[in-house]
């Protein structure tokens, strides 16, 4: 609008050089398992830092997993992205991320991982982590930062009290992204940027007679009004955008992980299926979907939640040099824990699994 194309060119050149430097640094720093560490090249940790803290209190995972979203440095299923997520998950506790190598829970930073799963199309894992994120919110949905010990009393340290403003912002934006988000084109290239609508749908939401909706939701492309109604054998999606000067390259609806697409009808001038998404030209207004339930994906959900808790490593305190001493986790099930049960993922199921595991761990300490 200002007509300063000279300034725009300068900023684009700077961004291109900066991205190139970051990619070179990642290639030089990535570990043998594909994990992208918390710093690039050689960086100081522990006593070498200005804070002089012990090693276990530094070098903490924070935003080093933001490799696919929103940065778009790598494709969501790139080895570095997936390996970094896998590496960080080993330090999870209570289904969320931790800080200081497992010493404390860290609620809201979990949203960073959820968004990587979201753009990778792994909506099941995104939902599991999301349900744990809100499980660790207060009665008015307030979030917290850290300073809460895993699998203990859940008392918040008064030096780090809730509610936490950034936790609220991250959670709100995450829920927004579950309804719609922009992706592609490395942010700047509008001609390669897509709009995803309802990209993460829970089995608990997709029941006959229920619906998801948004009214004048702000996006990079303007204001989006839409409604997704669930029917007996499918869904009906209506779409009424008020685009600005930009339109998305396409509008994409991801088929929920627990459904198998049978057919669809739309008034879009162009449409096709790609990467388990119905890809629609931005002129569409209606989409009718026929699908069927994939019941097998619901088998053993409760047992998987329990095994996930138990497979994570735990913080055993610092060693004699101040490094974190990690106690390896191991996935297992007790005799009364049936892995053959068919139970769709929902918040209540996650809460049930968490309470069971919490009681098991705390009762062993008495």
Descriptions of predicted regions:
Residues 2-13:
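Inter-helical turn/loop segments and adjacent helix faces that build the functional surface
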Residues 364-366:
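Short, solvent-exposed mixed-charge patches
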Residues 13-16, 35-186, 247-249:
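Active-site core of glycosidic bond-cleaving carbohydrate-active enzymes
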Residues 21-37, 41:
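Low-complexity, Ser/Thr/Pro/Gly-enriched N-terminal "stalk/linker" regions
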Residues 10, 21, 66, 79-84, ...:
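Exposed alpha-helical structural elements
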Residues 124-361:
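Non-catalytic C-terminal accessory modules of carbohydrate-active enzymes
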